[in-house]
Amino acid sequence: MARGRSRKRSRSSSRSPSGSGREKGGARSSAASPGPRHRLSSAAAREGRKKEGRKKKKRKAKASSSDRSSSSRSSSSSSSTSSSDSDTRAKQHSRRKRGKHKDKKKKKKMKKKLKKKSKERVKEERGVSEALPGPSLELWQKEPLADSGPVLTDEQKSRIQAMKPMTKEEWDARQSVIRRVVDPETGRTRLIKGDGEVLEEIVSKERHKEINKQATRGDGLAFQVRTGMLK
């Protein structure tokens, strides 16, 4: 009987590890094959990750769009400022031109007014001179010839004519005349062009000697007359 019990115990003990192995295998199988709850949680996590990725993409798109809008605004503002600067410059240039044109017009008007005033003054002076009573023809005819004044000589007439303005042609003709003038005191003869330009005459040696002799004689006589040596 004791042997039979020991065999049963050995069998039970031999069987017990197999049962424990079965339990372990069941635990392993349960751990290897997840349940429906675990599957649902993993799917929810995946969906959450996808949503977060979409949100990140949307944020990035918004940031890029905001950057683009800000850059476009800055470019538009810079273009508007540049256009406004160009407009102000053009306006200033046009104002300057208008101011210059107005100044020119004012100067022209002032010149015209001055010319008119000068013409009016000349007319008034002429009118006053014409209005003054002058000697009539009858008075001139009745006056004696002795009171008419001294008779003008040729030199005085020439001086009066010289005081009158001459044209360029008359001046050139007068200055082109060459004449030989003799000094009455010394007896020297000179070639004078125009009003007093002395010209040199080219002569031979013999003629030059004769001219010098005559000049020295004339100079000596003139000196004696001035000093009173000759009477």
Curated annotation (Swiss-Prot):
Q: Where does it mainly reside?
A: nucleus
A GO cellular component entry from the record: nucleolus
Q: Does the keyword Nucleus apply?
A: yes
Outline the segment boundaries, as ranges, of region: Disordered. Answer: 1-155
Q: Which UniProt keywords apply?
A: mRNA processing, mRNA splicing, Nucleus
| Compartments where found | Nucleus, Nucleolus; Nucleus speckle
Which InterPro entries does this chain map to?
Nucl_RNA-splicing_assoc_SR-25 (IPR019532)
Q: Where is the composition biased (Basic residues)?
A: 1-12, 51-62, 91-120
Q: Which Pfam families match?
A: SR-25
Q: Where is composition skewed (Low complexity) in this entry?
A: 63-85
Please give the biological process terms from Gene Ontology that the record holds. mRNA processing; RNA splicing
Which residue stretches, if any, does this entry annotate as coiled coil? Answer: none
The entry assigns this protein to a family as follows:
Belongs to the ARL6IP4 family.
Q: What is known about what this protein does? A: May be involved in modulating alternative pre-mRNA splicing.
Q: What is this protein called?
A: ADP-ribosylation factor-like protein 6-interacting protein 4
Organism this protein belongs to: Gallus gallus (Chicken)
